[in-house]
Amino acid sequence: MTAQETERIRRELADSLPHEMFCFQCEQTAAGTGCVWRQGACGKRSSTANLEDELTGTLIAYARCVHDAGVTSPCAHASLPMIEGMFCCITNVCFDDDAVRALIGRIRERIDHVSGRHGVDAADYPAYDMNLVWNADEDVRSLKSLLLFGLRGMAAYAYHARMLGADSQTVDDFFFRALYEISATDDPQTLLGLVLECGRVNLECMAMLDEANTSTYGDPVPTTVDLTIEPGPFIVVTGHDLADLEQILEQTDGRGVNVYTHGEMLPALAYPRLKEHPQLKGNFGTAWQNQQREFKDIPAPIVWTTNCLMPPKDSYADRVFTTEAVAYP
């Protein structure tokens, strides 16, 4: 049997199986085309994937409601649930169905609030059907997906900046406008313009986060990082939310508990304000994708702060802690 025949049979078999979800957000997606069965390549269950589609559709409904109400620049309070909802849908952030349902409820409350204040009917804003994106013309689907995934990535930066007290009206406005346009247009040129604009706005968002980080913790300096684990109790913090790490350091000051970064938290060791805490000892392990092997039987709690969570193995499942939008049931 040739490789081509094997691939044809594999695809026919795949097409014959019932599809329980659709997600092609990450480069590890099944067969390079999309995860469609009970569990995604990332470990996300189909129920969670479908709820995240509902959450995204509800965020689009929120954007439509704000647009129709004539609100051109939503305030920071109105924008935060939008940012948190987008952040929740990034790969490796949320595996908890109840947490997604709670976010959907918060967005519905925002729709009710806006409609009540501005004379529009909340009933006119059900969750947008994401199948209209996934099943659209190939070019339209590609552009809308690229825009949506870009918005989700930008939401992570915006959320971390917000936790440090920084926000940008330009960034916040673009979340609403871009999501509205996903539901309002199928014109490829309009969508391409929005994709390019997303890149420009994302650059501004990254600059905002960098300014928030450096103004709070100082400019990073060249730092030698210790990779050994000292005897005694310790905590591992992974992800890239510096505010969460700072809170853990403040709560462990003088308590004889050491703190180690992991994965994307490694750069935190270069910030002068964080280096002032002597219990921030160094880095444990390597990259986030190695966590299931590296955390096996680890005698310490691990705190996930951003999009780096993989379904935990039994050997350390009782030591998993998450913050903010990150959640595991």
Where are these regions (language model features)?
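Metallocofactor- and cofactor-centric catalytic cores in central/energy metabolism, strongly enriched
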Residues: T2-P329
